[in-house]
């Protein structure tokens, strides 16, 4: 279960989340819709502790995402999300882009992440583009 209680976030003086409160049950699928700049991506990133927030509380399966003791890679593995646009880093190679999330979100070592990434590149016939 995901639970948000009065979550607010600002970028400087601009408030992008205003006292957001909701509960999402395990297995429930939620689509976040709205116009450009309405805070959709910020909301999703905040739930996954990829973006800090200034006020309120967020819990995933009873664990507070803002608690420094929370195992964030484990927490993130329990919340599925699909972004509208991929956020790739143009200064990184294809392999580096593939491994970054595995290291940061799944907690894999760089070597484990590279092994997995190369396996999937090979599977889809893109090994020539790995560098």
Predicted regions: what is each one?
Residues 14-15, 73:
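Short coil-to-beta microelement around the adenine-binding A-loop and adjacent beta1/P-loop entry
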Residues 33-35:
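The feature captures the beta-strand-to-loop junction immediately N-terminal to the Walker
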Residues 65-80, 110-111:
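ABC ATPase NBD coupling module
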Residues 91-101:
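Short coil-to-helix segment of the ABC ATPase nucleotide-binding domain corresponding to the Q-loop/switch region
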Residues 63-64, 99, 110-129:
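Conserved ABC ATPase "signature" region
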Residues 48:
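Helix-to-loop junction immediately C-terminal to a conserved catalytic motif
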Residues 57-59, 63:
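ATP-binding/catalytic-site motifs of ATP-hydrolyzing domains
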């Amino acid at each position: 279960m995901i639970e948000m209680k009065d979550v607010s976030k600002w970028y400087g003086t601009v408030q992008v989340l205003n006292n957001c409160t909701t509960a999402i049950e395990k297995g429930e699928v939620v689509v976040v819709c709205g116009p450009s700049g309405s805070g959709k991506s910020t909301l999703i990133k905040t739930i996954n502790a990829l973006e800090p927030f200034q006020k309120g509380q967020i819990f995933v399966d009873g664990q507070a995402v803002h608690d420094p003791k929370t195992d964030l890679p484990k927490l993130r593995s329990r919340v599925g999300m699909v972004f509208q646009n991929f956020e790739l880093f143009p200064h990184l190679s294809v392999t580096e882009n593939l491994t970054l999330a595995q290291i940061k979100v799944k907690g894999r070592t760089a070597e484990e992440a590279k092994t997995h990434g190369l396996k999937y590149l090979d599977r889809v016939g893109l090994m020539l583009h790995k560098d």
